[in-house]
Amino acid sequence: FDVTLLFQEVKKGFMFADDHIIKAIQNLEKNNIIIVVVSSKIGRFGQGKSFRRFCKERGHRFLSATSLGDVNETYFDIFMETMNVSHTKMKKRAMKIKKMWDKAKTIRVKTEAGTDVTFDVEGMKAIINIGDYHERGSGGNMPAGEVYIPPKGYYGVHGKVVVDGSMRTEDGAILLTKPLVLYIEKGRVVRIEGENAHLLEKTFTKHEDRAKYPYRVRHAAELGVGINPSAVLIGSLILDEKVYGTGHIAMGSNYWFGGEIKTIYHGDQVFKKPIYYVDGERMEY
């Protein structure tokens, strides 16, 4: 194999990738393989499309492990163990969930901590992340282990989300000891409460100041469920959102996985012990 290793400075989500990275990937022959391992983000390409969409159009398969700067060295063994999992069993669980979500009109999530949020998902398709990327143009992040879906349009989410797992901010992920509460009306976060509310508010504001359409930043963009039985909460979103027995919600962009919202921000927030109701029926998974 002809392998090329490329390095660049640390990038935030709104920053552009270094020129030599952009040039190398744009000039890569079709149907190649790209592996991204970065402490934060790979950066933007300035093509009006996401890295994922770029890879799909060129037939590249890819693996990405982002935000590794959030992983404490003491958790490295735990992080690696999440990849030592039966992907066959995980796929079976993922396909069961996807089948239900693809047919759903609404998905409601409740938790003992107080989460009660409803997503209108009629006509939307769930995405599975199980680490199986054999087809050209496919790819995803590692460790694997989640199913997620965008809401229908901009306004199809309402309710309250009590984030008691981990939260994503501009400065990295935080393993929560006290919950963060998000109030969502007509698809948009209208109020944030909790000890760390100012950190998420700062994150939203920072991206709104840079976004072409600032109002999109606070829109609910994703509902997800973790299905990796080897994963545990460590304060790194790339792992935390995969933990079996957790759920997550994201605000910001979702156009690259079938949604309508396109913006420079995408941030996941993780909550514990979710119960999902698909068109009123409790989901067993």
Predicted regions and their residues:
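Active-site lining segments that contact anionic ligands and/or coordinate catalytic metals
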Residues: 158, 177-179, 186, 218-222, ...
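Acidic, glycine-rich active-site loops and adjacent beta-strand->loop/helix elements
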Residues: 40-42, 229, 253-255
